Amino acid sequence: EEKMNVTQGKLFLGYRTNTPPESSDYYAAALCGVILGQGTQSKLFVNIREKHSLAYYAAAYTNKMKGILFAFCAIDPKDRAVAEALIREQVAAIRNGEITTEEYEAAVKLLRNDLASYGDSQSQLLQYYFGQTFMEQIADPDEYARHIAEVSVEDIVKAAGRMTLDTVYFLTSEDEA
């Protein structure tokens, strides 16, 4: 926990994916991150922001090269315990296979649309390929999209099962006791 002169608390839960970036299982880990916290149909957005009205924003981000997934939200500092419990519940739900067809399809569509949009921007395409330079094999965006389409819900559940909580960080108000 860290205190600063802020009005919103920032809660981060850092998970190790335990999935090497060159593994074919990486695509399932990527979809796991999308289902957890990318887009308006993600579990964090629906449950923390919409259903419980706790967060100004709630999202997740996967860093392929570092093998980490961050789940994070901006909240009223008094809501830390509830928000942290809800994040943990959403990760557990994915581990337990509680992934709806809508969540799965929205995640696949979001990732595939992102990959398709790379061709519209030289800087995005450059950034994508720069990230690929550290890989044993370079997958172009179309190939990456094909791999995403091959991932099953069961693969995502297995990827979530490999994740381990590593770090909990909370930036809070100096006034919060």
Language-model segments: residues:
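His/Glu-based metal-binding/catalytic segments typifying zinc-dependent metallopeptidases
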Residues: 1-45, 171-172
